[in-house]
């Protein structure tokens, strides 16, 4: 019931996208929905059109605006709710930049990347760090942010 409440809350708060993307990705990969929500909160603030071009964040108001920005960006671009790096992961999944703007697909790809990172590291939280960066000093700060967000998600869900 708590998951349903949070998903309804998100669907009304998050630019109208269907928040069940997180639940579907969780079911498909085994990654806890709460962890996916926490990562998305840290990565994009639940903004489905969030784009980061070479370290510079943008929050386009519309998909149209986001597509224009993506056309002008190079390969080093993070896209969508889960800030999937297109230069690295786009080719591995055979996806275009515009495809990664789809919230359902973006969250699923992010969950699959996290699943890969968890397997590679052997730990949930090491996997979270690896999701962000292969460099350990960047991982620690990121894991702390996600941990705080994760606790917030759990609080909102009443668990």
Annotate each PLM feature.
Residues 10-13:
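N-terminal signal peptide c-region/cleavage motif recognized by signal peptidases
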Residues 1-2:
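Bacterial N-terminal signal peptides that target proteins for export
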